[in-house]
Regions:
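Active-site SXXK
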Residues: 9-11, 28-56
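Short, mixed-charge aromatic SLiMs
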Residues: 58-75, 145-160
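Structured C-terminal helix/loop/strand segments within mature extracytoplasmic catalytic/sensor domains
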Residues: 1-4, 20-21, 27, 131-219
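Short, well-structured active-site flanking segments
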Residues: 45-66, 90, 137-141
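Short glycine/serine- and small hydrophobic-enriched flexible loop segments
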Residues: 41-53, 85, 125-132, 212, ...
Length: 219
């Protein structure tokens, strides 16, 4: 879809991974949410591993280096306390993969709800299928929904409890970034999207479509 950055995509994470994977999207993970915690892009959480470039989002058995999290403003408690909350989430989830390369965003909106712990999942073949479906969706459904609640409505209409996902949207200089983490059938899905001169509603609509595709194709 016109305006979307190439790094828009979807990733499925599991606490048990046998193989190193290249996540489609390059070196950006603008927002990160986990188990109700939400950090804005002011938080830089870099993946550190021997012989690995953290900006490529390559996934492996790693340790994590937490760089200082800067608050977007004095009132932005989501940013100031995110490090401890995310670290606590890692203790429950087992492994987390993230690299952040964008600064200066302000938090536009955030909805936080509990997430279930993810279960093991064979990601490689499923991720490839989802990326192909994503390309089709972006070509065939370019329309913009007028409500910010599209994602919630879509999931509720499909019988998916909205308590199983969390999302946040940030914006700067005409660019918007949306990150959604959702628990589907015991799996953890991460949708990360960036658009230039596109609305928050558009990002949410595309995220909802992408999540539904994932839900329909999970084993």
């Amino acid at each position: 879809m016109k305006g979307f950055a190439p790094r828009t995509g979807l990733c499925i994470l599991s606490p048990v991974l046998k193989d190193t994977m290249q996540i489609e999207g390059g070196g950006y993970w603008p927002l990160l949410t986990l188990r109700g915690a939400c950090a804005t892009a002011a938080a830089e959480i870099r993946l550190k591993a021997s012989g690995m470039n953290p900006d490529t989002l390559r996934v492996n058995k790693t340790m994590f280096f937490y760089k200082a999290i800067e608050a977007v403003s004095d009132e932005d408690t989501l940013a100031t306390d995110a490090m401890a909350r995310i670290a606590g989430g890692i203790g429950c989830f087992g492994e987390l993969y993230a690299s952040v390369g964008i600064h200066g965003f302000k938090l536009a909106s955030a909805r936080n709800t509990p997430l279930n712990q993810a279960m093991p999942l064979d990601m490689a073949s499923l991720l490839g299928r989802l990326m192909r479906y994503k390309d089709h969706l972006f070509r065939e459904h370019p329309d913009i929904y007028e409500t910010q609640d599209y994602l919630e409505q879509s999931l509720e209409n499909k019988g998916w409890p909205t308590t199983d996902y969390t999302l946040a949207c940030a914006e700067v200089g005409g660019r918007r970034v949306l990150n959604v983490i959702a628990s589907v059938g015991g799996h953890l899905l991460v949708v990360f999207m960036e658009g230039t001169d596109v609305s928050e509603e558009t990002l949410m609509k595309k995220a909802g479509e992408l999540i539904q595709v994932a839900k329909d194709n999970l084993p």
